[in-house]
Amino acid sequence: MGGTVEEILQSLGFSANSLQTLYDVLLSPIADLLQCDDLVFVPDGPFCLAPYSALSDSVRIRTIPSLTALKVIAGATDEFYSKSEALLVGDPYLEEVTYGTGEPMFEQLPCAKKEVEMIGELLQTSPLTGRNATKAEVLKRMKSVALIHIAAHGDKYFGELVLAPNPERTSQKSEKEDYMLTMRDVYAVRLQAKLVVLSCCHSGQGEVKSEGVVGIARAFLCAGARSVLVSLWPIDDKATLMFMESFYEHLADRKSASLALHHAMKFLREKKVLCCWRKYSAIKYWAPFVLIGDDVTFEFGRHEHVKGVQLEYPKTV
């Protein structure tokens, strides 16, 4: 292998040879057996952190945390999931989230705001940004929507997402529970979402255990989401903006989430019309995105009186 799986993953930034090595280890042994263009891995241990979606141009790959999760998702009926509405959250106001010295803990993410505004235009949905993107409001709205997209800071160690502090709080200084969306918070919500997109730094890397990646992505699945799109390592905000624009354009064209992911990665890898795109052909920019859970297909704007999205479900054999 030329190193342990962990060593290969740590070097992934940055070396096409590492991606080829992962292909040789994970996909090459079964390549001749594949008779489909859609493949699901149930990874364990450090293999949870492999960028499966980037391993092949001919096969669309997604993952599932465990066989138990696969059974639950496969057994869920279409009627359970919401058919409309989207929750778009981007660039929460974080200037009140400070250290004891008064210095802000986090920088604002202007590209995240542009990201959800772009998606909002496509879905005819007003995004939550700035002071409106509070933890309380996000928890309130996420219960009934079909699509959740959060573009914000995330933490790889605890699976937490940083939102704007709740305005109703007992102390002048924002406490962690006022702005951190934790795994416990998500577990407590009964979701009806078909797809959750976490456009957040480190949003895919929780603590690795035998049941799968334990992080905010798994929390959303356990709370009822059918599929989650996450990034496995820190992501450049401009590259993410371009990636998401391509991803949602393909979703709007009624392509499945896995196929939209495939096209968006290819777009970022190959786009060379403008000089600013050239650096994004590096693996570290286009390869971190992975689809966890089921595959879904959206239909945008079928009924003009319905705000948000309408869903179609992929036919299964």
Where are these regions (language model features)?
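Catalytic cores of enzymes
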Residues: 1-317
